[in-house]
Structure formats: C-alpha cells, structure tokens
UniProtKB/Swiss-Prot annotation:
Organism name: Rhizobium etli (strain CIAT 652)
Keyword presence, Thylakoid: no
Protein name (database record): Elongation factor G
Cellular-component GO terms for this entry: cytoplasm
Recorded coiled-coil stretches: none
Length: 699
C-alpha cells in the first residue's frame, strides 16, 4: 500500500491551554469543520467527541490525550492530513501534556480572552519550550464578558516572555464579537450566525478599525522581516514584502520558535475556526521541517539521527498506553522514520525484547479503523504489545536505536487503598498495575511494615480518578485512606565515617572496610557517588558494591523512614581481604556506614512546597491571604487581572488538602485556584517533631 499523503502535507499538532480555556470545544469544532464529526459535541452537556472516558464527560475536563486523524483543504485547494492530540489543562495531568508535546511537531496554545495567560498556561508553555515546539496562539472566547484581546497580547510578553505576532484583530468583543480582520490580506471576515459558523462574508475593513489595522500590519511586517536579511534591507529601502512573502517569513519564524502568530475567535460560537485551520497549514511545521530525532546506537552507544523518511530504518516512540474496552491494551506511538506493517516484529530497545504488532489502528477520538501499513510522520495505536511502556523506543531489529526518553515528575501525594471485599484483592492488584503501566506519574507500592497498598500521584484529583477508573473499568470497589504527603529527608552537614564489616562463621567469612565522606550534594536533589581510591585499598571490582549499598538504604531515611534526597558520598579509603572480601561484603559495609553517618550528618525532614495561584474578586483578597498565611503559606505577590486579583503563594502541600472547599465557602464559589509542585523545603522543627512522632510509630 503506497503512502496516501506526502509527508510534507502532514501536520502533527496538539492543543494546549489552561483548564476551561476551551480546548475540547475548539477540537470539536475542528473535527466538525474537517468533516469527522456530524454533530457538534458540547462539553457542558457531556457529549464532546474527544472526551471519551466516562469521568471526563461527567467532570467536563479532559483527562487523557485522545489522538485523532482528520483532513483539511488548505487555501491552495490541496488536502492536508492532521494528526491532532487533545491535551488536559488540569495541573494534575501535566504528565499527559508533557508526553504529547514530546511527539508533536507543533501546537496551538489557547487563551481565554477574559483571563489571558493563566497559571496552567505558563506551565504548559514552559513544557513546550523544553521540547522547542513551534506554537501558534488562539485567543478564544472573544464573545465572553470581559474579553480583551489586546490585554492577552500584552500578557504573552509580560508573563510568558514570548513575542506574539498578531495576524488578526477582533471586530467587536463580548456579545458584539462579529468576526476578524485578516492583517495579511487586509480584509474583514464576518461570520453568518445562522450557518453554524460554516459561512462568512469577506468585506472591507470597518472604517473605525482601519487605522488600527494599518498599525498592527506595520508591526507584523517589522517583526517578520527581522529574520531575513534581504527582506529587511528591502523593507528599509521602502519596499514592502508581498502577502506570500509575509506568510513565508511568518512560517520560518514560527518553525524556528522566534515568535508565535496569534489569532482570535470563539470556538463555542463557531467564529474563527476555519482561518485557524488554514494557519495550521500555512505556519505549523510538517515532519520534514523539524530537526531529525536524536538517539543512540543500541550496541555502540554512538549518537545517531533518524530523519522523517520512509526509506530510513523504522524508529518510533511509544508515548501512551491506554486500556481500550474492545481491543485491550493499546500503545500509541509516533513513527519518526521508516515504515511499519501489521504483523511485523519490532525491537523494544529499552527492554531489549522483540514485540509483534498484532493490529494497527488509526484513531478518531474513541472510534477506530484498522490499517495495514503506517509511515514516517504517522501517529498510530498498536495492539498486541506485551512489554512496552511509555517512553520506550520501538525500531527495526536489524538497525536498533534508543531515542531520547521522556522525563516524568515524581508523585507528591499518596494514599493507602484496600479492596472492600477480600475476593477483590487480586483484581485490585491487577487493575492498579494496568493503570500504572498507562500513567508513569502514578505509582503503586506495598508498605513493608504494614503490608498496605499505597498509591501515589500528582494530586487529589489524579488519585480520585484512578480509584474511580478502578471501579468503572475493573469493577473493583475500594476503601481509601486520608491523603498522605510524600515527605523526603536529607542531610545538612558533612561527616566522615569509617566502618568495618566482619563476619566469621565456619568456611569463608565476610570482610570489608570503607571510609566514606557524606555531605549535601551541591548539584541538586539526586544522589551522587564518587570514588577517590588510589593504590587499590578497595579493588575496582568492589566499588560498585559500595555505591549499591548506599543506594539501597537511601529509600528509608533515619528520621521517619522517608526516601532521602541530595546526598553525595565520596569513598576515600578502605581495606579488603584476599579470601573473605566480596561485592556483597562491601555492599553490607557501605549500607551500615551510611546508617551510622546519617545520624551525625544533621538529618532534616523536607516537604513538598506547592506554587499556588488564587484568582479572586477583590472583596475576598484579605480573607484569602489570611487563610494562606494560616496554612504556613508564603505570599509571593499579587496583581490585578481585569476585575479579579491574582494572589501567588508557596504553601506546604500538607496544608492544602480540601482547600477547594474552604476557598469556595470563603468566596461564595467565586474564587478559583491552581496548584503545581514547586520544590522541596525544610519542615519547621516544631512541625517536623510531630511528623516524626506520627511516622516513627508506623515504621
């Protein structure tokens, strides 16, 4: 089967934003206008096509990224293939955003025209910066009370430090929003309300907006000619670029992430969506426009690149595992190079296991079509993979490569969970393991002392939804404990410890002596190990045992048994015995050595500090600040945003449970907040004593 669409006609993009900026509605409109959805789904009646898990339809938020393939005819009359990923905007699900950005070529960042740049907008923007994803901006909800396009443009500069290139100006705002001015063509598009947004009239720019349109077109040209010397020279000599040249320069600057073209409209009222789709074709990259994917040779560890080309060896990245009620486990993968055929065998280079592709599916939200072959640039769902997890590389077994892996955040909250009936114990274990395979930011472990099952995640909502999915998808009812904070421990001063491990029973004994300096790691929260052994006092082959021994006890600190962060260990001396020494003996010695040293190294308890932003009407500012202070919060600042005030604070996670209920009653339901993990900080001594007493009793 030959490729149906040329790779330069592909656009792989996602839609990213703050919760409630209208992502799912915008995606719905895109699917409607590109002919994939016959009935427009509204989020508030629970019918949106992309939100296909039951919980999403109930809560009106998008939880998992659903991948959809659809098609659009550009301004040149040529059909393009769109692979769209809908991403969640709730902070508990930033992992979903992160993994979809990793496999996309471009993105549309959505803003709520009333709120502008919100806290979660900043979070997803930073994630997109990390992967250098070209972005366009769509200022949505222009029909909303308080909508202010120009303030949103300013906030992109002040809050994101980014350059927005304004491509359209709104005609009217709030309930008077009628259409947009196209600053390239210099005409106005007015939508016909009765046509569900399918039709619009191209008219002259309204008289009262002509001067503003001229001013913004001038700004647009000034910004885009800066990226091209010849265009800049021509412009300085008084020669304006023509419309095609402007589009070409906007495309180049967008793909090079120099600036971000900005559009406006209202997806809910069906205005502005089609020009946005034309802009996806005009300005977002095809797989050929982005740098080749980097990886390392599976055998030699040499750096290699794979290009978006069907003729190159197959390489793809598994970016999501999903449980499908009809097909079972589905692995979503982005093909970077080569071709994939149904039934073929691929190598998982991370696990060093071969996998057979049973079925290959093209997904449209939650409907699917079987395909026989897929090509470079495609995003496909694969059935039948047994060993593959998120972030694994799948490739041609004869040309193995390991692509750059994704980074996943550590969970900050945990709860104990048990099945309501004894018979469900096994089913619960199976369900939790399945859900953990789907979501790398969700962990399951068994508490060694109590035997309880502990689940950990990114927030209360995250764990609520896990428990809910267990009930719905796996029919397991569970009791959950109160949320527990994922505390950590560290050391605060340097100490030197000399420890000898000797064991003599009949036959071969055990002997190992180690002298180690332990100190806080100046480079961050990871564990760092160094050996400064000279002269062979500890033979080379035993040194990994020393490191392994220390690492094995870092999972349980001396104060209350929490994992330890930010420790550096330097092996400076030791001794061995020709017969009685072994890797195991050195492992045991270093383990005991660290346990002794940790008592003297000023162990300290750390707690997760959350970055909290509260958006509240002015009347409640005093109450909100007072309440945050009472939660040991540190107020970082406040700013006015329209008629609301935004309060930023760092607050310990331990004091933020059920905050949403307090905030609601304090503000009569008018204030909102977002919370993301910021850093670990020392716990004040009076609080630390309580925590130690509580947890030491459990250990």
């Amino acid at each position: 089967m030959a490729r149906e669409y040329k790779i330069e006609d592909y656009r792989n993009f996602g839609i990213m934003a703050h919760i409630d900026a209208g992502k799912t509605t915008t995606t719905e409109r895109i699917l409607y206008y590109t002919g994939k959805s016959h009935k427009i789904g509204e989020v508030h009646d629970g019918a949106a096509t992309m939100d296909w898990m039951e919980q999403e339809q109930e809560r009106g938020i998008t939880i998992t990224s659903a991948a959809t393939t659809t098609f659009w005819k550009g301004r040149d009359g040529k059909m393009r293939r769109f692979n769209i990923i809908d991403t969640p905007g709730h902070v508990d699900f930033t992992i979903e955003v992160e993994r979809s950005l990793r496999v996309l070529d471009g993105a549309i960042a959505l803003l709520d025209a009333n709120a502008g740049v919100e806290p979660q907008t900043e979070t997803v923007w930073r994630q997109a910066e990390k992967y250098n994803v070209p972005r366009m901006i769509f200022c949505n909800k222009m029909d909303k009370t308080g909508a202010d396009f120009y303030r949103s443009v300013e906030m992109i500069k002040t809050r994101l430090g980014a350059t927005a290139v304004v491509m359209q100006l709104p005609i009217g705002a709030e309930s008077d929003f009628k259409g947009v001015i196209d600053l390239v063509e210099m005409n106005a598009l007015i939508w016909r309300d009765e046509s569900l947004g399918a039709q619009w009239d191209v008219v002259e720019i309204p008289e009262d907006l002509k001067a503003k349109a001229e001013e913004y077109r001038e700004k647009l040209i000034e910004t885009v000619v800066e990226i091209d010397e010849a265009a800049m020279e021509a412009y300085l000599e008084g020669n304006m670029p023509d419309n095609d040249k402007i589009r070409e320069l906007v495309r180049r600057g967008t793909i090079d992430v120099k600036f971000h073209p900005m559009f406006c409209g209202t997806a809910f009222k069906n205005k502005g969506v089609q020009p946005l789709l034309d802009a996806v074709v005009d300005y977002l990259p095809s797989p050929l426009d982005i740098p080749a994917i980097k990886g390392i040779d599976f055998k030699t560890e040499a750096d290699i690149e794979r290009h978006a080309d069907d003729a190159e060896p197959l390489s793809m990245l598994a970016f999501k595992i999903m449980n499908d009620p009809f097909v079972g486990s589905l692995t979503f993968a982005r093909i970077y190079s080569g071709k994939l055929e149904k039934g073929s065998s691929v190598l998982n280079t991370v696990k060093d296991k071969r996998e057979r592709v049973g079925r290959m599916l093209q997904m449209h939200s939650n409907s699917r079509e079987d395909i026989e072959e897929a090509f470079a640039g495609d995003i496909v769902a694969l059935a039948g993979l047994k060993e593959t997890t998120t972030g694994d590389t799948l490739c041609d077994p004869l040309k193995p490569v390991i692509l750059e892996r994704m980074e996943f955040p550590e969970p900050v909250i945990q709860i104990a969970i048990e099945p309501k009936s004894k018979g469900d114990q096994e089913k619960m274990g199976l369900a939790l393991n399945r859900l953990a395979a789907e979501d790398p930011s969700f962990r399951v472990k068994t508490d060694q002392e109590s035997g309880q099952t502990i689940i950990a995640g990114m927030g209360e909502l995250h764990l609520d939804i896990i428990v809910d999915r267990m009930r719905r998808e796996f029919k397991v009812e569970a009791n959950v404990g109160a949320p527990q904070v994922a505390y950590r421990e560290t050391i605060t001063r340097q100490t030197e410890e000399d420890y000898t491990h000797k064991k003599q029973t009949g036959g071969t004994g055990q002997f190992a002596r180690v002298k180690i300096i332990f100190e806080p790691n100046p480079e961050g929260e990871d564990f760092k190990f160094e050996s400064k052994i000279v002269g062979g006092s500890v033979p080379k082959e035993y040194i990994p045992g020393v490191q392994k021994g220390i690492e094995s006890v870092l999972s349980s600190g001396p104060l209350a048994g929490f994992p330890m962060l930010g420790v550096k260990a330097t092996l400076i001396d030791g001794a061995f015995h020709d017969v009685d020494s072994s890797v195991l003996a050195f492992e045991i010695a270093s383990r005991a050595c660290f346990r002794e040293a940790a008592k003297k190294a000023g162990a300290q308890l750390l707690e997760p500090m959350m970055k909290v932003e509260v958006v509240t009407p002015e009347d409640y500012v005093g109450d909100v600040i007072g309440d945050l202070n009472s939660r040991r919060g540190q107020i970082q600042g406040q700013e006015t945003r329209g008629i609301a005030v935004v309060i930023s604070a760092n607050v310990p996670l331990a004091n933020m449970f059920k905050y949403v209920d307090n905030l609601r009653s304090m503000s009569q339901g008018r204030a909102q907040y977002t919370m993301t993990f910021d850093h670990y900080a020392p716990v004040p001594s009076n609080v630390a004593t309580e925590i130690q007493a509580k947890y030491s009793g459990q250990k």
